[in-house]
């Protein structure tokens, strides 16, 4: 059974039953849920939609393709056929709404334990037999924030932690860094990103079917159009956005395609990074001090980038595109024209930039992060992270430019092609729902091995 479903290329057998229809008083208001689209933690909502909603109407997923979508292939309404049970609990969304109302005071909890999580977990235990039958071991809860379930009281955590967690931060370093990650119990999933999952910027409007940059973004890459389609629940990364197919458009496509066949633009920029440097009081707790190398420093540790060393920073290099931020469409254009994406840590080892890089065909560069640094990446048994990324240890972070320039064209192309053909499967999207298929494979392995958290395992 599980030897088949866990074999490469085989369709996983486990079904995920969304049998829990929480009563209205235990559901988050629709206004809160819609607001959480703008949260970096909304992977919990995206995973739920992939199971419970039909593929997007704009998708070409019909026939066999639709049958392979998680909504059809990995969900059953019959609990007797279910191997695992998905709990529609969204505490990250609850806290995001709480922090918005509190002016981003992230120590606020807005009674998330007593008002939301504990009543919902009590209902699941008392209204359904499935939790008690397994001690919760065959139940799935999503915890997409940096410190997993560390935001909640011990009583709340005890009510949840016999289940399998789907987490975005996998860290096997000694405490305190890896305190909340359970190596043999949790499954690491991708984070959502603002660029793709909030603003619905479509990479295929900036790169062609092979992952090479378009001479100009397609007409559908219009931010006004995306705002008009803001109600769509899913981003698109595999097909270009639909455009008007009138005569003028068809003629334009003909000449554009003719031009693209003559000359495919190359990625002209070597490396890209968008992000900040933390606070002066953070020291090396933020980014292990690595990001201070990216920006010019006057040697004053009290001013950004908070370094005691004087240097011009990678931002001064002509083939490094380093900045605090960019407008979304400008950032998308730059991603499409860049070879490598820098991935230093922040407060944790993971970075949402990774999934933007993969979606745009940019080769990720783990700097002080990645498996060699103690980071657990999503679906390591099924995804060849080594073959589509570069890993640079922290003590060689200052050598990033020379290391990247030493990579041969052939090696870069191998990694770029693997990113495009394999890496995009790890990005949260709605057309294919590959993330759920990868989750199912890992659940299959856990079931085969008899791994079950049980009430005796706690997050300490």
Task: Describe the predicted segments one by one.
Residues 11, 77-83, 133-136, 262-266, ...:
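Extracellular/periplasmic catalytic domains that process cell-envelope and extracellular macromolecules
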Residues 70-74, 126-129, 205-207, 254-259, ...:
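Eukaryotic intrinsically disordered and solvent-exposed regulatory patches
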């Amino acid at each position: 059974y599980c030897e088949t479903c866990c074999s490469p290329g085989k369709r996983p057998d486990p079904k995920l039953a969304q049998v829990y229809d929480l009563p209205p008083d235990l559901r988050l208001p629709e206004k809160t849920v819609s607001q959480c689209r703008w949260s970096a933690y909304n992977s919990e909502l995206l995973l739920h939609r992939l199971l419970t909603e039909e593929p997007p109407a704009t998708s070409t997923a019909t026939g066999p393709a639709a049958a392979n979508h998680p909504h059809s292939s990995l969900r059953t309404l019959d609990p007797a056929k279910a191997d695992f049970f998905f709990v529609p609990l969204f505490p990250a969304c609850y806290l995001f709404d709480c922090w918005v109302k509190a002016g981003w005071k992230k120590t606020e909890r807005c009674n998330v334990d007593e008002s939301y999580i504990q009543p919902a977990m009590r209902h699941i235990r008392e209204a359904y037999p499935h939790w008690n039958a397994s001690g919760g071991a065959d139940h799935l809860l999503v915890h997409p924030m940096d410190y997993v379930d560390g935001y909640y009281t011990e009583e709340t955590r005890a009510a949840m932690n016999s289940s399998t967690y789907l987490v975005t931060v996998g860290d096997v370093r000694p405490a305190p860094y890896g305190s909340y990650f359970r190596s043999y119990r949790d499954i690491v999933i991708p984070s959502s990103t603002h660029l793709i999952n909030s603003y619905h910027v479509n990479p295929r409007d900036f790169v062609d079917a092979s992952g090479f940059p378009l001479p100009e973004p397609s007409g559908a890459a219009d931010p006004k159009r995306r705002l008009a389609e803001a109600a769509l629940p899913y981003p698109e990364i595999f097909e270009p956005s639909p455009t008007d197919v009138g005569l003028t458009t068809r003629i334009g496509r003909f000449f554009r395609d003719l031009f693209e066949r003559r000359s495919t633009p190359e990625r002209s920029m070597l490396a890209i990074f968008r992000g900040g440097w933390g606070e002066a009081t953070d020291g090396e707790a933020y980014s292990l001090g690595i990001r201070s190398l990216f920006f010019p420093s006057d040697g004053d540790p009290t001013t950004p980038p908070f370094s005691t060393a004087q240097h011009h920073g990678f931002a001064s290099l002509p083939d490094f595109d380093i900045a605090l931020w960019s407008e979304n469409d400008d950032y998308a254009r730059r991603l499409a024209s860049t070879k490598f994406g820098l991935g230093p840590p922040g407060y944790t080892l993971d970075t949402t930039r990774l999934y933007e890089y993969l979606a745009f065909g940019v080769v990720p560069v783990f700097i002080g992060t990645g498996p060699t640094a103690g980071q657990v990446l999503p679906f390591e048994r099924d995804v060849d992270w080594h073959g589509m990324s570069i890993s640079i240890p922290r003590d060689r972070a200052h050598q990033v430019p020379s290391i990247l320039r030493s990579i041969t064209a052939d090696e870069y192309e191998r990694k770029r092609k693997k990113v495009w053909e394999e890496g995009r499967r790890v990005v949260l999207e709605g057309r294919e729902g590959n993330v759920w298929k990868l989750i199912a494979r890992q659940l299959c392995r856990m079931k085969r091995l008899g791994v079950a958290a049980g009430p005796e395992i706690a997050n300490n």
